[in-house]
């Protein structure tokens, strides 16, 4: 009997050893050891984030966002697949990180000593602060002592720790932590006048202002703090070391700067009147032209084409400038003839020709310019001509920059209006500063359309879910009554 028992124990030990050899990550996931090895064995990197217009979102059925693109590049360097895990708030994110169910938390997370004690942290790659947001045209408090109504925050214990410290200075400070709504949803409720104040990340407030200009910033709650990725706490530093090397390389190669330009560059510019007018136009004018933008988009995103048209004419088919350009895409007579259209004020002809002209400009660019950046170069040419774009690229090279990099060329565009520079260029003087602002505006307008529709879709999804829940509750009540 004793021999049988020993044989059973031995067999079980061999079985567990075999399972561990075949599926080692099943054990490693739930320990603090060999986390980097577990990722390699699993073949995928689990990154937790929050769905919003900066960190992560779905656009045209593909994943986008600052944190997504940076995480994808990191996964590529590790030689593994990327799998994004989406959470509603930071506490859900940190809870899963603490359980080792994700490998990284990446959602523009501000540094906090409490979190630094609980987790490993990656290198700083940006900065932000906590701000008090209120609704424009309401009384603006000067400090926390002036706040007389409810302050709302999302589920964020680190922020609560900060507020508890501030409470020593402002004893009357009270806040409400909403565990049901995301930070973005709280800001949207604030914009609609449903709640009076929200404390949120400065990056998220600036992003939401692009589609909800009613939002205003009262003051900073904290000084700017570094933004980091957080990793599970572990005696092993392999993953943290790999992340440090990756971030250093991302800084050196310009990847970080390019992502900041792509996702954060446009949100630094905010004009209440312009944004309010634009959002009204998106709601009331764009729907009548969006089918045409979609029809003639070609290889472009139709929302970019729409943004170009708004920058050109504010979606006015009869627009005319003193220089003779006309129509919703503001085409010159020569461009109209080149694109073979007869009536520049006909919206369909104008949009078709404008799109074809943009595609033609893109085709004239050297192949050395990356696909994703080619449109920005083409827009400069659309605004001030292909010759001046050639000059801007040549000037960038002369000044030691990369003529194929949009960030490098962009900063030199204003120099086309300075005599010491344009006098040495083939095509001479150009209002390069206007071309610079032209592209910036279009990027901002496009992102606003994307995020306006994203918010609308999310609200529709939430409304449908609430309706289904209400119907289910009614059915349960009816069953109980029967």
Swiss-Prot record:
It catalyses: Exolytic cleavage of the (1->4)-beta-glycosidic linkage between N-acetylmuramic acid (MurNAc) and N-acetylglucosamine (GlcNAc) residues in peptidoglycan, from either the reducing or the non-reducing ends of the peptidoglycan chains, with concomitant formation of a 1,6-anhydrobond in the MurNAc residue. The active site is at residue 312. CDD domains: MLTF-like, PBP2_YfhD_N. InterPro entries: Lysozyme-like_dom_sf, MltF, Solute-binding_3/MltF_N, Transglyc_AS, Transglycosylase_SLT_dom_1. It is found in: Cell outer membrane. Its main location: membrane. Residues 473-482 have a biased composition (Basic and acidic residues). In the N-terminal section; belongs to the bacterial solute-binding protein 3 family. The N-terminal domain does not have lytic activity and probably modulates enzymatic activity. The C-terminal domain is the catalytic active domain. NCBIfam families: PRK10859.1. PANTHER family: MEMBRANE-BOUND LYTIC MUREIN TRANSGLYCOSYLASE F. This is Membrane-bound lytic murein transglycosylase F. The lineage of its organism: Bacteria, Pseudomonadati, Pseudomonadota, Gammaproteobacteria, Pasteurellales.
């Amino acid at each position: 009997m004793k021999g049988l028992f020993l044989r059973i124990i031995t067999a079980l030990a061999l079985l567990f050893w075999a399972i561990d050899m075949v599926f080692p990550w099943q054990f490693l996931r739930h320990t603090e050891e060999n986390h980097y090895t577990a990722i390699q064995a699993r073949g995928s990197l689990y990154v937790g984030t929050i769905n919003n217009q900066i960190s992560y979102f779905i656009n045209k059925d593909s994943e986008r966002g600052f944190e997504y693109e940076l995480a994808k590049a990191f996964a590529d360097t590790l030689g593994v697949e990327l799998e994004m895990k989406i959470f509603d708030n930071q506490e859900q994110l940190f809870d899963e990180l603490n359980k080792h169910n994700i490998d990284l938390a990446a959602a523009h997370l501000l540094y906090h000593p409490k979190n630094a004690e609980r987790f490993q942290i990656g290198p700083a790659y940006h900065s932000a602060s906590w701000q008090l947001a209120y609704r424009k045209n309401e009384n603006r408090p000067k400090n926390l002592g002036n706040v007389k109504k409810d302050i709302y925050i999302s589920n964020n214990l680190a922020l609560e720790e900060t507020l508890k410290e501030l409470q020593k200075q402002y004893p009357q400070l009270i806040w409400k932590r909403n565990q049901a709504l995301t930070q973005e949803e709280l800001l949207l409720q604030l914009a609609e006048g449903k709640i009076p104040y929200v404390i949120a990340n400065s990056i998220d407030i600036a992003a939401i202002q692009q589609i909800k200009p009613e939002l205003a910033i009262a003051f900073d709650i904290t000084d700017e703090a570094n933004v980091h990725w957080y990793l599970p706490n572990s005696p092993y530093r392999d993953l943290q070391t790999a992340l440090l090397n990756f971030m250093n390389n991302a800084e050196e190669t310009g990847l970080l700067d390019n992502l900041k330009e792509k996702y954060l560059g446009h949100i630094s510019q905010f004009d209440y009147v312009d944004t309010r007018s634009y959002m009204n136009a998106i709601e009331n004018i764009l729907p009548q032209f969006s089918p045409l933008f979609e029809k003639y988009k070609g290889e472009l995103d139709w929302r970019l084409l729409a943004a170009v048209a708004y920058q050109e004419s504010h979606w006015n088919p009869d627009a005319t400038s003193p220089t003779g350009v006309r129509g919703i895409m503001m085409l010159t007579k020569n461009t109209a003839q080149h694109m073979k259209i007869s009536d520049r004020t006909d919206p369909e002809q104008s949009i078709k020709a404008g799109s074809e002209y943009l595609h033609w400009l893109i085709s004239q660019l050297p192949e050395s310019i990356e696909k994703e950046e080619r449109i920005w170069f083409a827009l400069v040419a659309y605004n001030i001509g292909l010759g001046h774009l050639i000059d801007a690229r040549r000037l960038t090279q002369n000044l030691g920059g990369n003529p194929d990099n949009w960030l490098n060329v962009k900063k030199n565009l204003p120099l086309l209006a300075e005599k010491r520079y344009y006098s040495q260029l083939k095509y001479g003087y150009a209002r390069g500063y206007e071309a610079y602002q032209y592209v910036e505006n279009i990027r901002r307008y496009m992102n606003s359309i994307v995020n306006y529709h994203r918010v609308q879709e999310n609200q529709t999804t939430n409304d449908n879910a609430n309706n289904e829940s209400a119907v289910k509750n009614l059915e349960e009540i009816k069953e109980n009554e029967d």
